[in-house]
Amino acid sequence: MLVLVINSGSSSLKYQVRDVASHSVLTEGLIEKIGMGNGGEGDGEIEGPRDHAEALEQVDAAIHEVLGDRTLDAVGHRVVHGGERFGEPVLIDNEITRAIERLNPLAPLHNPANVLGIRAIAKKWPDMPQVAVFDTAFHRTLPEHAWRYAVPDSLYTNHGIRRYGFHGTSHEYVSHQAAALLDLPVEEFDGVIAHLGNGASVTAIRGGKSVDTSMGFTPLEGLVMGTRSGDLDPSILVFLGRAGWSTEDIDSLLNRESGLKGLAGNNDMRSVVEASEAGDARAATALAVASYRLAKYIGGYHVAVGGAKALVFTAGIGENSHLFRALVGDKLGALGVELDAGLNSQRSKEPRVISTAASLIPVLVVPTDEERAIAEATAAVVHSAS
């Protein structure tokens, strides 16, 4: 089955065509500045379109050059927020599209853009099966004590204020890969997965199910990220409001000017590491704060899963920054974690163990592949519906 995987943003459209049977990527690309001018990159030169419908025409042309007479069988969409309704991928129809739109208040920057992609596909290929794969779905198994905030019940019942979690597609995919590497059925996998990119989250997995995760009502909660603060005292927001900051100013501060950028002046982990190694005190502090925050979460989630059978690093930083992994590992000695310096420093695109034989908890690096996960989920839903 050939699946077109779509990640539709408000001004961008990322696409990839996967052959599900062979796991191969046939073509991929990114169209940017939709409605804003020219922009695009991929296997062919793509100029910026007026809207998502025009963007899709350009995607179609680029795909046709590669596929020739072969045709797409389905489209899988990354949808950021599935709320409490969607706990698994679903075949999209008009009612599902409207349900996703009703969740717009919970993800105002993402869900409306996801729907633009869905509607563009439906207009161009009305008979094409479309499947929504939700970032939040894997975390629908969180027990109430993990997803509840200690605020009046009316905030949950009237406004849906609770912890949802994100990066679920990645965490689920990586948990299966990690279990296979350890020769365990996924139903017996108890572990902690750290998805570390510009956005970062850590998830506690028990029996193959998510039982806690660091992101909450929004992707702002939790770890120190590229430009997001992660956890902080909520009274700081009240303090800033009383000092004259607008809600827009505070939102921008916490989501776009904080994290590594706020601490070190740069949101790119590679640059922060280089600066730290060159003696930059701000960069060293940023790494210390970020690694300490993650280590605290890992310790707590070791308890949440009843004793972790594995600690797994994934995503851009988790897969590639051996120095950051070492900083985190050094803080986990109380759990019996011991990284092998040689294995940790090796680069590979394959799942691998980077801990010593004496480590009480195996430490793994497992590359994530969200597009593959979305393509496989899409194929499964379409097959079950046929």
Curated annotation (Swiss-Prot):
<keyword id="KW-0963">Cytoplasm</keyword>
<keyword id="KW-0067">ATP-binding</keyword>
<dbReference type="InterPro" id="IPR004372">
    <property type="entry name" value="Ac/propionate_kinase"/>
</dbReference>
<dbReference type="Pfam" id="PF00871">
    <property type="entry name" value="Acetate_kinase"/>
</dbReference>
<feature type="binding site">
    <location>
        <begin position="268"/>
        <end position="270"/>
    </location>
    <ligand>
        <name>ATP</name>
    </ligand>
</feature>
<feature type="site" description="Transition state stabilizer">
    <location>
        <position position="228"/>
    </location>
</feature>
<dbReference type="InterPro" id="IPR023865">
    <property type="entry name" value="Aliphatic_acid_kinase_CS"/>
</dbReference>
<feature type="binding site">
    <location>
        <position position="7"/>
    </location>
    <ligand>
        <name>Mg(2+)</name>
    </ligand>
</feature>
<comment type="similarity">
    <text>Belongs to the acetokinase family.</text>
</comment>
<protein>
    <recommendedName>
        <fullName>Acetate kinase</fullName>
        <ecNumber>2.7.2.1</ecNumber>
    </recommendedName>
</protein>
<dbReference type="InterPro" id="IPR000890">
    <property type="entry name" value="Aliphatic_acid_kin_short-chain"/>
</dbReference>
<feature type="binding site">
    <location>
        <position position="14"/>
    </location>
    <ligand>
        <name>ATP</name>
    </ligand>
</feature>
<keyword id="KW-0479">Metal-binding</keyword>
<feature type="site" description="Transition state stabilizer">
    <location>
        <position position="167"/>
    </location>
</feature>
<feature type="binding site">
    <location>
        <position position="78"/>
    </location>
    <ligand>
        <name>substrate</name>
    </ligand>
</feature>
<keyword id="KW-0418">Kinase</keyword>
<dbReference type="GO" id="GO:0008776">
    <property type="term" value="F:acetate kinase activity"/>
</dbReference>
<dbReference type="InterPro" id="IPR043129">
    <property type="entry name" value="ATPase_NBD"/>
</dbReference>
<feature type="binding site">
    <location>
        <begin position="195"/>
        <end position="199"/>
    </location>
    <ligand>
        <name>ATP</name>
    </ligand>
</feature>
<dbReference type="GO" id="GO:0006083">
    <property type="term" value="P:acetate metabolic process"/>
</dbReference>
<keyword id="KW-0460">Magnesium</keyword>
<comment type="pathway">
    <text>Metabolic intermediate biosynthesis; acetyl-CoA biosynthesis; acetyl-CoA from acetate: step 1/2.</text>
</comment>
<comment type="subunit">
    <text>Homodimer.</text>
</comment>
<dbReference type="GO" id="GO:0006085">
    <property type="term" value="P:acetyl-CoA biosynthetic process"/>
</dbReference>
<feature type="binding site">
    <location>
        <begin position="316"/>
        <end position="320"/>
    </location>
    <ligand>
        <name>ATP</name>
    </ligand>
</feature>
<feature type="binding site">
    <location>
        <position position="370"/>
    </location>
    <ligand>
        <name>Mg(2+)</name>
    </ligand>
</feature>
<dbReference type="GO" id="GO:0005737">
    <property type="term" value="C:cytoplasm"/>
</dbReference>
<dbReference type="GO" id="GO:0005524">
    <property type="term" value="F:ATP binding"/>
</dbReference>
<keyword id="KW-0547">Nucleotide-binding</keyword>
<feature type="active site" description="Proton donor/acceptor">
    <location>
        <position position="135"/>
    </location>
</feature>
<keyword id="KW-0808">Transferase</keyword>
<comment type="function">
    <text>Catalyzes the formation of acetyl phosphate from acetate and ATP. Can also catalyze the reverse reaction.</text>
</comment>
<dbReference type="GO" id="GO:0000287">
    <property type="term" value="F:magnesium ion binding"/>
</dbReference>
